[in-house]
Every structure is written in structure tokens, then in C-alpha cells.
């Protein structure tokens, strides 16, 4: 699909400088732009590429002034980076604008779905499932009984949603995600064997949540495991039974959160963080990668290390840690002097 500079400017509320009929059919980085591509410039570090790019159209900030002739048509907007992000989203919507029901697939007679459904081949929809409008369900997705899904939700290939799970609107769930599998609940017996504790709760995913590939979110033992509105989860995260993730909290890959821990709003959690169970983590907390959390955390704390301590304390301690060989050498020299009298 092709767009002219004028059409793009209308979408972005921008102003064209150059050829208004310049056509583009793809997006590219400014240093790799070719004829027919659209790119953007927002970081001054890349300004030199504007004068060498072969891109047909380039989005720039409205206060940008060229210092020499350019071969690309400019579209001036208030915020070039944000405008390009808008186009990426628009492009993605066009690319993913599938509809219809492919065969073979299965929809239970008691299931209900809204307009604009796309159901890929070998997908399965169980009994009493409710699906909203404009939902895209890609091949090999499994949706168990009594699941409810809102509007404008995308489930990429291979997603598994166990029974009773509730998914809001504007949610994106990437390939390989498992929602609602049993939590890790086992009761030790007197002779060392384990008995399984039935997990009869569910999972609730609120609106505007994004879940990365391979992430697993276990159902609650009782009640609900909850991912609040706007949370962003990276790939390969393990969220255990009865965990609650607060609104607009972002968690990087390979983090594991043990059962019944509550995490507040607007937290940032780095990759490979381990969080013990039954903890309360406040709002706006920042946890650096590979940290180990074993205690409750107050609002606005910044932590690093395993076990995690305050970020500034960690940096001070690390300086001393790096100097340990030198410090030990000094101590040995002093010991020799003392022992030799």
C-alpha cells in the first residue's frame, strides 16, 4: 500500500516541504532509507544522514532548519519521534488487519463473538467464551471454557488461555504466552511426598496490557492473579499464583515473581530479577537487573544487588568490592611490618 507525503501529513497534522506527491510504501531507518521509504529524524546525532539518505520522505521536528539541500521531502511536525511512532502503529494495524474464520478451527456453539473477528487455522474456542469486537486470534491459539475477552485484542500464534480467565480491551498477547495454568501449589506430607493443592482461582488481565512472548501467568489458588491496566511485560517472565502487578508497571525479561506478592503502580523492574513470595512492593519502585528481592519495598525506592540494597549504597559497596585485592595487599604488607617489628 502506498501513501503520498500529503496523505501522511494529514494523518500527522504536519506540513510538507518538498514534493507533496512523493510516494512511500515502507518504513526505514534514516541511514538505510531508500526510494519509496519513509523515515524520521529526531536525534541530532543522526542529522548528517538527512543529507545523504535516499528516503523519499523524512519526518522532522517543526523547528528543524536544513543547512544544505536535501533530496528527501520533509514533513514537519511538533514531535518527529512521536509522529513516527504513530505511523508505526498505523502501519502495524494495516499489516495485522485480518478478518474471517479459517478452517480447520473450532468455535463451541455456546461461544459468542463480536464483529471483525479473525480466527486462524487450528485455533480452538471453548464453551461459554465471550469475545468482543475486532479481536485477532492467530493460528494454534487455545481459549478455554468461560473465558471473556474484550475489544481490540490480539492473541498471536500459540497463545494458551486457560478456563475462567478474563482479558480486557486493547490487550496484546504474544506467541507462546500461557495464561491461567496451575500455580506451583504442593503440600508436603509426613514422609516427604507432595500432594497437589487444587488451583481454582483465575487470571485477570486488565485493559491496555502488553504481554511478551513466552511469559507465563499462573491462576490463583483462590481469588485472582491480576495484571492491572497498562502494565507491560517483556518476554519469558514467570508470574506465580495470586500475584498482583500494578497499573503501568513495566517488567523486563526473565524476571520471576513468587506467589502472592503485590507490586504497585508505575514500577520499573529490570531483567532477571527474582522477587520472593508474599511481599508488598510500593509504587514507583525501580529495581535494577539481576537483583534479588526478599523484603517489602516502600514507595519510590531504587534497589540493586542480591540481596538487593539501596541503589546508591550498592554503588558505594561495589567500589570497595573492586578495590578488595588492593586493600588486602595493603593489609598483608602492614601485617608483615608489624610481625617483623
UniProtKB/Swiss-Prot annotation:
Example of a GO cellular component annotation carried by this entry: membrane
PROSITE patterns: HEXAPEP_TRANSFERASES
Subunit annotation: Homotrimer.
EC number annotated for this UniProt entry: 2.3.1.191
Top-level taxon: Bacteria
Keyword Lipid metabolism: yes
Residue spans crossing the bilayer: none
Protein's GO biological process: lipid A biosynthetic process
Active site (UniProt): 241 (proton acceptor)
GO molecular function annotation: N-acyltransferase activity
Keywords: Acyltransferase, Lipid A biosynthesis, Lipid biosynthesis, Lipid metabolism, Repeat, Transferase
Disulfide bonds: none
Keyword hit for Acyltransferase: yes
The organism of origin for this protein: Christiangramia forsetii (strain DSM 17595 / CGMCC 1.15422 / KT0803)
Protein family according to the UniProt entry: Belongs to the transferase hexapeptide repeat family. LpxD subfamily.
Listed Pfam families: Hexapep, LpxD
Task performed by this protein: Catalyzes the N-acylation of UDP-3-O-acylglucosamine using 3-hydroxyacyl-ACP as the acyl donor. Is involved in the biosynthesis of lipid A, a phosphorylated glycolipid that anchors the lipopolysaccharide to the outer membrane of the cell.
Annotated metabolic or biological route of this protein: Bacterial outer membrane biogenesis; LPS lipid A biosynthesis
Catalysed conversion reaction: a UDP-3-O-[(3R)-3-hydroxyacyl]-alpha-D-glucosamine + a (3R)-hydroxyacyl-[ACP] = a UDP-2-N,3-O-bis[(3R)-3-hydroxyacyl]-alpha-D-glucosamine + holo-[ACP] + H(+)
Protein name, per record: UDP-3-O-acylglucosamine N-acyltransferase
Classification via InterPro entries: Hexapep, Hexapep_transf_CS, LpxD, Trimer_LpxA-like_sf, UDP_GlcNAc_AcTrfase_non-rep
Amino acid at each position: 500500500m502506498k501513501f503520498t507525503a500529503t496523505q501522511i501529513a494529514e494523518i500527522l497534522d504536519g506540513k510538507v516541504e518538498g514534493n507533496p506527491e512523493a510516494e512511500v510504501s515502507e518504513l526505514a531507518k534514516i541511514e538505510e532509507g531508500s526510494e519509496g521509504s519513509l523515515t524520521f529524524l529526531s536525534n541530532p546525532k543522526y542529522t548528517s544522514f538527512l543529507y545523504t539518505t535516499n528516503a523519499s520522505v523524512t519526518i522532522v521536528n517543526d523547528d528543524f532548519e536544513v543547512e544544505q539541500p536535501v533530496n528527501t521531502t520533509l514533513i514537519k511536525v511538533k514531535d518527529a519521534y512521536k509522529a513516527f511512532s504513530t505511523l508505526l502503529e498505523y502501519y502495524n494495524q494495516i499489516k495485522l488487519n485480518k478478518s474471517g474464520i479459517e478452517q480447520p478451527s473450532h468455535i463451541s456453539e455456546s461461544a459468542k463473538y463480536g464483529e471483525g473477528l479473525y480466527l486462524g487455522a487450528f485455533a480452538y474456542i471453548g464453551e461459554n467464551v465471550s469475545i468482543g469486537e475486532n479481536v485477532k486470534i492467530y493460528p494454534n491459539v487455545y481459549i478455554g471454557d468461560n473465558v471473556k475477552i474484550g475489544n481490540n485484542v490480539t492473541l498471536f500464534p500459540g497463545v494458551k488461555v486457560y478456563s475462567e480467565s478474563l482479558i480486557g480491551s486493547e490487550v496484546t498477547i504474544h506467541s507462546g504466552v500461557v495464561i491461567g495454568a496451575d500455580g506451583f501449589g504442593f503440600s508436603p506430607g509426613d514422609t516427604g511426598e507432595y500432594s497437589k493443592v487444587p488451583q481454582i482461582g483465575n487470571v485477570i488481565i486488565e485493559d491496555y496490557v502488553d504481554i511478551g512472548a513466552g511469559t507465563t501467568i499462573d491462576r490463583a489458588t483462590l481469588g485472582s492473579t491480576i495484571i492491572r491496566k497498562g502494565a507491560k511485560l517483556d518476554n519469558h517472565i514467570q508470574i506465580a499464583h495470586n500475584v498482583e502487578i500494578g497499573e503501568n508497571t513495566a517488567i523486563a525479561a526473565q524476571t520471576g515473581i513468587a506467589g502472592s506478592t503485590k507490586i504497585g503502580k508505575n514500577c520499573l523492574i529490570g531483567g532477571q530479577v527474582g522477587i520472593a513470595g508474599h511481599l508488598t512492593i510500593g509504587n514507583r519502585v525501580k529495581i535494577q537487573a539481576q537483583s534479588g528481592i526478599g523484603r517489602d519495598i516502600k514507595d519510590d525506592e531504587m534497589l540493586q544487588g542480591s540481596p538487593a540494597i539501596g541503589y546508591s549504597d550498592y554503588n558505594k559497596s561495589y567500589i570497595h568490592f573492586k578495590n578488595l585485592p588492593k586493600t588486602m595487599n595493603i593489609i598483608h604488607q602492614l601485617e608483615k611490618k608489624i610481625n617483623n617489628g
